[in-house]
Amino acid sequence: MRSRSNSGVRLDGYARLVHQTILCHQNPVTGLLPASYDQKDAWVRDNVYSILAVWGLGLAYRKNADRDEDKAKAYELEQSVVKLMRGLLHCMIRQVDKVESFKYSQSTKDSLHAKYNTKTCATVVGDDQWGHLQLDATSVYLLFLAQMTASGLHIIHSLDEVNFIQNLVFYIEAAYKTADFGIWERGDKTNQGISELNASSVGMAKAALEALDELDLFGVKGGPQSVIHVLADEVQHCQSILNSLLPRASTSKEVDASLLSVVSFPAFAVEDSHLVELTKQEIITKLQGRYGCCRFLRDGYKTPKEDPNRLYYEPAELKLFENIECEWPLFWTYFILDGIFSGNVEQVQEYREALDAVLIKGKNGVPLLPELYSVPPDRVDEEYQNPHTVDRVPMGKLPHMWGQSLYILGSLMAEGFLAPGEIDPLNRRFSTVPKPDVVVQVSILAETEEIKAILKDKGIDVETIAEVYPIRVQPARILSHIYSSLGCNSRMKLSGRPYRLMGVLGTSKLYDIRKTIFTFTPQFIDQQQFYLALDNQMIVEMLRTDLSYLCSRWRMTGQPTITFPISHTMLDEDGTSLNSSILAALRKMQDGYFGGARIQTGKLSEFLTTSCCTHLSFMDPGPEGKLYSEDYDEDYEDDLDSGNWMDSYDSTSNARCGDEVARYLDRLLAHTVPHPKLAPTSRKGGLDRFRAAVQTTCDLMSLVAKAKELHIQNVHMYLPTKLFQPSRPSLNLLDSPESPQDSQVPSVHVEVHLPRDQSGEVDFQSLVSQLKETSSLQEQADILYMLYSMKGPDWNTELYEEGGATVRELLSELYVKVGEIRHWGLIRYISGILRKKVEALDEACTDLLSYQKHLTVGLPPEPREKTISAPLPYEALTKLIDEASEGDMSISTLTQEIMVYLAMYMRTQPGLFAEMFRLRIGLIIQVMATELAHSLRCSAEEATEGLMNLSPSAMKNLLHHILSGKEFGVERSVRPTDSNVSPAISIHEIGAVGATKTERTGIMQLKSEIKQVEFRRLSVSMESQTSGGHPSGVDLMSPSFLSPAACIAASSGSFPTVCDHQTSKDSRQGQWQRRRRLDGALNRVPIGFYQKVWKILQKCHGLSVEGFVLPSSTTREMTPGEIKFSVHVESVLNRVPQPEYRQLLVEAILVLTMLADIEIHSIGSIIAVEKIVHIANDLFLQEQKTLGADDTMLAKDPASGICTLLYDSAPSGRFGTMTYLSKAAATYVQEFLPHSLCAMQ
């Protein structure tokens, strides 16, 4: 008989340990593990982690088998794992209705339960009696389902189960925007049942999605139908949000030890090695103690100060748990595993020794890992005074099976029984390894032969869409519809993937659908409902963004391939040449670089071997040879009106396979194109219809008169509040380019001269006749507007003999017409009438919220300014925006547009939003108009009109300059660049010498430019280089510096007006006021501002801002680094409606925070910040008067009472705001200051 090897003996020892601590508790029927002896429920997360030691031991036996007996042990252990995983599957599959509902609702009431009955797999508590929504638990199950399947275990047994797992993928793919209760089941750390976005859930979901992608759940015995499909864009959404959260864990937890499972084993979800190390160091620095790590700061679980009879904490109670949080040895097991996977032998040795010291020896010397160590109740005060000095006692479960399992797994790996690749067969541990450079393949296609000829004349040789056959080209929305059939199962009542827009990663692959290759055009070209794709410059910008995104986020095998079609809308207005922006982009791509990406242009057929190609096996024919299974026909036949056209498919011919699929997609394409005479709109009647009609082209006086004729009472109740002034100007009536001879016809308001019949009523037929005769697009829009408001959208004008035409249809036709000539003011105007909404609006809103940015729409104060703090359904979101816009459809449309741009920048340049936690879109729009008025030296009316007439690309560019803080200027010309009707307004970056880029390079000189642009603001570096903090060459005492710009002093409106007598000496006037207005509107504060506010609150009873108090008790609930605290402070500051005044209050608070570093216990009760600002204002006025300034120069802002010059003063220097604010703060709190500090007075 062969003797047992040493390794075999050691493995037998681990087998005894596993049986005595884990497997002895496994239910023989369900395979589930109870939480402990006294807690018989089975938690999903704990079960998965607890079985890992069994799985690892089985792999070790399989690898190190000395005898057949060892192989039998390996099989037994592996089947114990399979039994548990299938037990959890049975628990969840019983709740299949919840999975179906949650895909659409993301509601906590529709979530899978977090724990089940160990004996029956049934639920144990009600939907609303536990924090069930824990996406990390479902994700960790799916992650190890993938890893175990890849290691050779057979867990999934039927296609029904495959479909269920596919729907679990849809369940977790929205983790990046779903607030849940997290790994500790508490949600917000106040333990009041408030869900929040958790980095641990997002990271684990990202790992599970990546692990399952293209995995065959039947293993080597599977086929195409058992493969799981994951959309790469959803994975990257999770990655973006995860990177934006880390090293924070959530809005209420600035750090959490559970993040170890995200940055290291098992998820390995973070690709940035620096961020991985930063997160680990945060955990070690802030959470590690002598017995393990705290879960998070101020965690009250099982501490002596926790009241076990009360489920929730009081917010101020959290301070009691500081420094006495329980320490969990569990997290040291993660550090051991992390050291093994990263090859850090010293780390492994250090934490193994530390863990051995806290293990408890059980019966027969069995090492047991306790759940946690707590401070003894009689030594709490001692621990408060000297943290980490008191000896703690073990509490909770013994052993803690989750920790016990990871301890055993770490020991097996540390002793060489398992290699990292065996426990991680999907190679997730290489996530931080640098990826090879990405070359984006771009295939340029011409829509027609004519466009191909035009491109050839420019030296660009392309194919037409017809010439790439047999490769099929389809728009992105078709791919969304195709994926909506993925996971369908009528027997389980699973509908498949919810319809969502397709991202650029999804459209940059080729797809094999029944042996036919399909390629899909980018989503941004396929904008059906909104007008962004009408702007060729915007198309170029979105293409540049997508290319850059692909280079940084592409992780799949093969190179990304973008199919870029050139359509007739990308031609110039004469249709004989290509738009200059499009042509320039094509030339750059041909040169090999565009948008920071390496580009390879070529034919689609040349890219077949190098592209990433996905086989959509779920599109393969069913058992009877049909294109789809019966499930899909039932779900989508009615929606697509497909009839029986696909029932006669004959599967014997591969050629006919491709043709049949093509016919199906063509049919689908036809049904997804909106009918040209059925543009989306909403019927309005009565007063609502009238209110909708009060818009930019309406004369208010004539509307009042017309309202009397319509017998509408209290008409002023329905007139919208204007954005910038009491009465919004009407847009200029600009004639159609087809009739230049009419260009001198004066602009008229149609409603002023409404034709009347003999009885005095409005003669609508005459109005229709006017509509037919006029060639002015503006007049056509005005007339249709009046018909829309007075007769309704479905009124038949009988304009055409055959069938007539409704108002809605005519507006849609006009929309197309103005779109062709790029009249952006009218495009937005008609888009507002027709209630056209941006398709990705709700996704844009959700993206912003997922980055922990709250949104407000409308202008302050509340309740006019509406706050969006959680994702909303599309209809609810558009309704809220309409309400905040107070009936102004143009503002409503612009708000949606700005929201989309903000989301674009958030995804690509999140650094623009540093230290901003609330994006106030109403104020941003107002500031954009103000900047136009200031830069162009024009009136409010002209600025408003100019803003509405900006092209989408120019609007996005202006927004970027405002967000980035770059120097920029604006030029206006009567010679337009892209339209015969819209005035051109271009935004240029300012160079070091103060000229615009175009002037500096001499590319173009606009003879008709109105005025030289001026700087947006002076850079801090420029200011610091000058004496006293003021720009060199500026006389501080000169009227041009001390007084407001003459135009501001003389103007009674919201914006400065043109002043001809201004000189170049005045060019810097208003710079600091503009900067404060911008920073205040954007909620921009200095780095570390909120942490400093937290410190000052500890030394006073609170800060008062215009009557709203930020109490010191806030610090008892929240820690300095919490996003929740920053949002709370920001919400108090946002009570101030004037942005520049708000920013001055921020500067005053900054001065106060300097007092926090002084060794003083208290600096008073509640500090009124606005009083400090007003004291500083008085000091400033006194000093300026002694220097000879008169009352005209020292004009005050009527809203705040602050001198305009103080707003326009630089922060530093003798006359800087910080000087006066420091003196004012010292005056206000001098009785609490040391005597030496009062000397500054």
UniProtKB/Swiss-Prot annotation:
State the InterPro entries in the record.
Answer: 6-hairpin_glycosidase_sf, 6hp_glycosidase-like_sf, GH15-like, KPBA/B_C, PHK_A/B_su
Summed up, the tissue specificity of this protein is: Both isoforms are expressed in muscle.
| Pathway(s) where this gene product acts | Glycan biosynthesis; glycogen metabolism
Q: Which UniProt keywords apply?
A: Calmodulin-binding, Carbohydrate metabolism, Cell membrane, Glycogen metabolism, Lipoprotein, Membrane, Muscle protein, Phosphoprotein, Prenylation
* Listed GO biological process terms: glycogen metabolic process; positive regulation of glycogen catabolic process
Q: How is its activity regulated?
A: By phosphorylation of various serine residues and by calcium.
The superkingdom listed in its UniProt entry is Eukaryota
Region listing for Calmodulin-binding, in residue ranges: 811-841, 1064-1104
Q: How does it sit in the membrane?
A: Lipid-anchor
- What GO molecular-function term can you cite, just one? calmodulin binding
Q: What modifications does the entry list under PTM / processing?
A: Although the final Cys may be farnesylated, the terminal tripeptide is probably not removed, and the C-terminus is not methylated.
Residue positions bearing lipid (S-farnesyl cysteine): 1238
Q: Where in the cell is it found?
A: Cell membrane
Check the record and name the Pfam families matching this protein. Answer: Glyco_hydro_15, KPBB_C
Which residues in this protein are found as Phosphoserine? 629, 730, 736, 739, 759, 812, 973, 982, 986, 1008, 1019, 1021, 1024, 1131
Q: Record's GO cellular component, any one?
A: plasma membrane
Record's function text: Phosphorylase b kinase catalyzes the phosphorylation of serine in certain substrates, including troponin I. The alpha chain may bind calmodulin.
The family annotation for this protein states: Belongs to the phosphorylase b kinase regulatory chain family.
Subunit and interaction comment: Hexadecamer of 4 heterotetramers, each composed of alpha, beta, gamma, and delta subunits. Alpha (PHKA1 or PHKA2) and beta (PHKB) are regulatory subunits, gamma (PHKG1 or PHKG2) is the catalytic subunit, and delta is calmodulin.
Q: Which PANTHER family match?
A: PHOSPHORYLASE B KINASE REGULATORY SUBUNIT, PHOSPHORYLASE B KINASE REGULATORY SUBUNIT ALPHA, SKELETAL MUSCLE ISOFORM
Q: What is the protein name for this chain?
A: Phosphorylase b kinase regulatory subunit alpha, skeletal muscle isoform
Organism, scientific name = Mus musculus
Q: Which gene encodes it?
A: Phka1
